[in-house]
């Protein structure tokens, strides 16, 4: 019998493919500023890094630049207005969630996305009433890789960290899970760039398709 009694997911790049809408917002902003759009295949690996990563890619700026904040505010508004334009569950996630629910294994979401973006996204995708918990980047005082959101999720779903699997597509996800003593799994199908050496993350496992997670349960 499996020791795992709950599965917790990162959101962008693990549970939901949000790169198309993040890319749409970035390219719309670029075109408004007179620049050419960026190909989707270049945007995708940055999609897990939020506005900082995407604006860095598109405009070659950092948060220290004077025009960063105005561009960030416009980017977020564009994304917010198009948050489920194309975003959808990754292939295989719908079946995985159904199988978890059919076997009474609670599942939840732990993301660094702020609540004002997380809530409409999960609600419009019909996940809000199904997830046992939804932890956003500003739900607790610290975000991933700090263990605080992980431990708070466990508290909400009445599970011990040692009995939880956390699956994500970024190094901070794996660090957060390990910091909370969870079993960690890398979603290699997510937003991982060619420069990421995921073996260095020292996760407990790697999957290339959501269905492979069932082997752990």
Q: Where are the regions that the model predicts?
A:
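Asp-based, Mg2+/Mn2+-dependent phosphohydrolase catalytic module
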Residues: 1-5, 41, 101, 115, ...
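N-terminal helical cap/lid subdomain that shapes the substrate entry/recognition surface
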Residues: 2-95, 101-103, 114-116, 127
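Glycine-centered flexibility sites
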Residues: 13, 48-50, 92, 108, ...
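Conserved SAM-binding loop
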Residues: 15, 89, 107-110, 142, ...
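A generic structural signal for short
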Residues: 15, 84-85, 106-107, 138, ...
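Conserved short hydrophobic patches within well-ordered secondary structure
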Residues: 22, 47-48, 75-76, 110, ...
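Residue-level detector of anion-binding/catalytic polar loops
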Residues: 36, 106, 183
């Amino acid at each position: 019998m499996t020791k795992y009694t709950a599965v917790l997911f990162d959101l962008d790049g693990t549970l939901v493919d949000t790169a198309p809408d993040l890319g749409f917002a970035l390219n719309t902003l670029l075109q408004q500023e007179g620049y050419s759009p960026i190909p989707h295949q270049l945007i995708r690996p940055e999609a897990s890094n939020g506005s900082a990563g995407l604006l860095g890619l598109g405009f070659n700026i950092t948060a220290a630049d004077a025009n960063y904040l105005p561009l960030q505010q416009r980017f977020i508004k564009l994304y917010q207005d198009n948050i489920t334009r194309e975003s959808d569950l990754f292939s295989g996630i719908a079946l995985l969630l159904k199988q978890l629910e059919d076997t009474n294994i609670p599942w939840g979401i732990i993301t660094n996305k702020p609540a004002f973006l997380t809530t409409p996204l999960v609600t419009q995708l019909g996940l809000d009433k199904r997830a046992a918990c939804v932890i956003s980047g500003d739900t607790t005082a610290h975000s991933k890789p700090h263990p605080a959101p992980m431990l708070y999720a466990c508290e909400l779903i009445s599970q011990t960290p040692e009995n939880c699997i956390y699956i994500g597509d970024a190094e901070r996800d794996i660090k957060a899970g390990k910091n909370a003593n969870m079993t960690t799994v890398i979603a290699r199908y997510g937003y991982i760039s060619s420069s990421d050496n995921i073996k260095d993350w020292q996760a407990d496992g790697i999957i290339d398709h959501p269905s492979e997670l069932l082997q752990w349960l």
